[in-house]
């Protein structure tokens, strides 16, 4: 079974919460950005990654705004579920922007990245990475992949919400980047069942198809699917 959750920020205690107990061997947990367990390559971090690698289920995440992209990009690219991902551990994968994965006969469009609200502070302290912001080329590649699939997928996994959702939720309403316009185009031009996103640090359903996820661990499919 496939589940989805929100930003983890390298907090291993999240895996001890009751919501995570539903995960079983063979399940897949999708994380909507800010995975955060690959940050400083410390011994403590390596210990935590080892614990995660011993889980009986698979963890697959899109990147968010609080990631060490220099470290992430050191992991090799592999084919996974019909798309390309970085192999972190045998059961941990970094989903690449614009890729489409087939999981349990369902198609998932993944697109990480975004813009840090604390950009100026993090830039000054040396822990901000330009790669957090999706490039025009990444967006163009995503469009090509969607077109190859007749602009139809089952589920969308992102870190940022579309611009119209930011207005609805009252978060970052002044912030408009190319990625937000791209997501608005997806709303208008693509067919999909549900769209899950992180970043906003809230758990909320926005009718009819959108899910802001943070601490919830939601099954992707339900009876209506």
Model-derived features with residue positions:
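Beta-strand-turn-beta hairpins that frame and shape the catalytic cleft
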Residues: 1-3, 99-110, 155, 207-211
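Structural motif
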Residues: 4, 28-32, 155-159, 196
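Core catalytic region of metal-dependent phosphoesterases/phosphodiesterases
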Residues: 5, 10-103, 172, 179-183, ...
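Catalytic metal-binding/acid-base residues of hydrolase active sites
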Residues: 8-9, 35-36, 65-68, 114-115, ...
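A structural signal for the main folded, soluble domain(s) of proteins
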Residues: 21-23, 103-105, 145-152, 211-213, ...
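Conserved beta-sheet core of the metallophosphoesterase superfamily
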Residues: 58-62, 84-90, 163-225
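Active-site-proximal loop/helix segment associated with metal-binding centers of metalloenzymes
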Residues: 83, 90, 103-177
């Amino acid at each position: 079974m496939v589940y989805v959750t929100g930003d983890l920020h390298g907090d291993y205690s999240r895996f001890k919460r009751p919501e995570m107990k539903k995960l079983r061997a063979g399940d897949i947990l999708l994380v909507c950005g800010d995975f955060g367990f690959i940050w400083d390559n410390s011994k403590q971090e390596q210990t935590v990654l080892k614990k995660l690698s011993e889980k009986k289920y698979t963890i697959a995440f899109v990147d968010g705004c609080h990631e060490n992209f220099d470290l992430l990009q050191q992991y090799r690219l592999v084919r996974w579920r019909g798309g390309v991902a970085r192999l972190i551990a045998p059961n941990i994968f970094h989903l690449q922007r614009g890729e489409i994965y087939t999981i349990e006969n369902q198609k998932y469009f993944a697109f990480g990245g975004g813009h840090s609200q604390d950009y100026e502070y993090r830039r000054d302290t040396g822990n901000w990475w330009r790669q957090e912001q999706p490039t025009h080329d990444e967006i163009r590649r995503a469009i090509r992949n969607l077109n190859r699939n007749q602009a139809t997928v089952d589920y969308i996994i992102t870190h940022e919400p579309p611009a119209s959702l930011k207005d609805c939720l009252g978060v970052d309403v002044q912030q408009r980047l190319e990625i937000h316009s791209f997501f608005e185009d997806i709303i208008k031009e693509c067919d999909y069942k549900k769209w899950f996103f992180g970043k906003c640090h809230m758990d909320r359903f926005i009718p009819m198809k959108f899910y802001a996820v943070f601490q919830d661990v939601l099954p992707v499919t339900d009876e209506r699917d």
